């Protein structure tokens, strides 16, 4: 680890060509293993213990030294001289090494920014999941229009590498990265399909997440720049910004560029109440003003993806809807703004008036059907929601089986405590409860009724329904009216760091 830190200090003074040698260092792979991102990447399936093998890494580095100068042609692509005989196994190890190495420049930039307070302002747009909750509670009810946008995947993963090259100037490293990706990911096709991207993301999660998140951050940095300068922009002058070579020069000398090139297209366009929220691959664009301005921003998104990232997206895929008539999905919730109408009688002197008051209320609904679909995918129930046993857990002890089911139930209750109607979670708890009982009965080779009668486990399984109330009673006074009121209100817990694993907003 000391050698790693010394190399980082040397890399601070060298602005380029410092990543390539790291891929041949053994301690890089040891660092990847110590982070325990993928427990099985350093283990050959030969019956040995699941431990980090320095011999495997030495063998891999030797092969890379011998073969990294080769350029694989179309005739030799099937032989795969770069990865050797055990392609999938070595590819996973190299992928982890690439993921560690490529994060180093950004770690250096972040650590240097922490030493200089004025640079921290560049990271002010970085927010956690907790910043979304106040937006939902405080801002959403005051907005009228919303656009639910799915950020498209790039048409080819080569685009991700090219975006990264603008920030990291290390040509040998990127040549080696391309050589690895072309061999392992089959990038010979002109268009990378969504299925191949999904396969790559599952087999190399860390490297893919880094490349994809960097792509999203790059798109957001340009979007936020355009958002801040929107008073100077017009649609027909917007595409000029996608010349990558001049983009940062234009951003630094915005006034001079506008005065020289865009003086004939300057118009006033400002929407001070437009809000942008993103989580994972979905973003929400909301505004209080007329849909005309929202339509402007929709075309900005289309031109941004097509002209800068070579991502084809059609305008009809982005819909602009009224919040009062449309619900959208975010963070595993269904959200809509409901209009509550009430009539108030007002009297002035001898005249009486009926005044209609319209108030907005935010409804945050638990998506029961997607949750049941996720439970069915995880083999807790069938597609109709009927509970089934979990035979793969039957080898564990009774306590471990019950604890696993309780942990899932606890996480779901904890995460969805911000919903308006928490009683809808009882159906999910019921499925998990019966699935737990059927799993225990399957383990003991008995029926559900006979197992419950013999073991008396029914009282223990009541924890599926009582645990959340016990947690609240530890925080708040043990008053039935207080707990009943808290059960109706939304509570956002601060220990929620990511969306629930059973929630998939694809």
From Swiss-Prot:
Family according to the record: Belongs to the intron maturase 2 family. MatK subfamily.
Residues making up the signal peptide according to the UniProt record: none
Protein name: Maturase K
Matches recorded under InterPro entries: Domain_X, Maturase_MatK, Maturase_MatK_N
PANTHER family (alphabetical): MATURASE K
Lineage: Eukaryota, Viridiplantae, Streptophyta, Embryophyta, Tracheophyta
Gene transcribed to yield this protein: matK
Entry GO CC: chloroplast
Domain of life: Eukaryota
Functional note: Usually encoded in the trnK tRNA gene intron. Probably assists in splicing its own and other chloroplast group II introns.
Compartments reported by the entry: Plastid, Chloroplast
Molecular function GO terms recorded: RNA binding
Native species: Melilotus indicus (Sourclover)
Keywords from the named record: Chloroplast, mRNA processing, Plastid, RNA-binding, tRNA processing
GO biological process, one term: mRNA processing
Keyword Amino-acid biosynthesis part of the UniProt annotation: no
């Amino acid at each position: 680890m000391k050698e790693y830190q010394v190399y980082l200090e040397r890399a601070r003074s060298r602005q380029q060509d410092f990543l390539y040698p790291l891929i041949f260092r053994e301690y890089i792979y040891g660092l990847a293993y110590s982070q325990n991102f993928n427990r099985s990447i350093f283990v050959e399936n030969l019956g040995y213990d699941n431990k980090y093998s320095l011999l495997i890494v030495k063998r891999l580095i030797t092969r890379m030294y011998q073969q990294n100068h080769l350029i694989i042609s179309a005739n030799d692509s099937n032989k795969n001289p770069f990865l050797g005989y055990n392609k999938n196994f070595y590819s996973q190890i190299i992928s982890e090494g690439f993921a560690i190495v490529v994060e180093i420049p950004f770690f250096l930039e972040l650590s240097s920014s922490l030493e200089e307070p004025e640079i921290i302002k560049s990271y002010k747009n970085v927010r956690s999941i907790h910043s979304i909750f106040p937006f939902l509670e405080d801002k959403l009810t005051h907005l009228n229009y919303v656009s639910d946008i799915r950020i498209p995947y790039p048409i080819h993963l080569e685009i991700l590498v090219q975006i990264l090259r603008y920030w990291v100037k290390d040509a040998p490293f990127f040549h080696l990265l391309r050589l690895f990706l072309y061999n392992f990911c089959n990038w010979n096709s002109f268009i990378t399909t969504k299925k191949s991207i999904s396969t790559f993301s599952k087999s190399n999660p860390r490297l893919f997440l880094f490349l994809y998140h960097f792509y999203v951050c790059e798109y957001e940095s340009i979007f936020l720049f355009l958002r801040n300068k929107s008073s100077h922009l017009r649609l027909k002058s917007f595409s000029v910004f996608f010349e990558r070579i001049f983009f940062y020069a234009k951003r630094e000398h915005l006034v001079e560029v506008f005065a020289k090139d865009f003086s004939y297209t300057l118009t006033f366009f400002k929407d001070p109440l437009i809000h942008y929220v993103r989580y994972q691959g979905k973003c929400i664009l909301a505004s209080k003003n007329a849909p005309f301005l929202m339509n402007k921003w929709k075309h900005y998104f289309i031109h941004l993806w097509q002209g800068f990232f070579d991502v084809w997206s059609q305008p009809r895929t982005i819909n602009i809807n009224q919040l009062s008539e449309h619900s959208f999905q975010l963070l595993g919730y269904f959200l809509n703004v409901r209009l509550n109408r009430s009539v108030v009688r007002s009297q002035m002197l001898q005249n009486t008036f009926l005044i209609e008051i319209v108030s907005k209320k935010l409804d945050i609904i638990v998506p029961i059907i997607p949750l049941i679909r996720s439970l069915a995918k995880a083999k807790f129930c069938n597609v109709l929601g009927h509970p089934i046993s979990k035979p793969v857990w039957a080898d564990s002890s009774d306590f471990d089986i019950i604890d696993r089911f309780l942990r899932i139930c606890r996480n779901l209750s904890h995460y969805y405590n911000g919903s308006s109607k928490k009683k809808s979670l009882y159906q999910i708890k019921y499925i998990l409860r019966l699935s737990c009982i059927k799993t225990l009965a399957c383990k003991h080779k008995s029926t559900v009724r006979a197992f419950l009668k013999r073991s008396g486990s029914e009282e223990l399984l009541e924890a599926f329904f009582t645990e959340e109330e016990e947690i609240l009673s530890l925080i708040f006074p043990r008053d039935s009216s207080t707990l009943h009121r808290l059960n109706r209100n939304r509570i956002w817990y601060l220990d929620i760091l990511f969306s629930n694993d059973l929630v998939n907003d694809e």
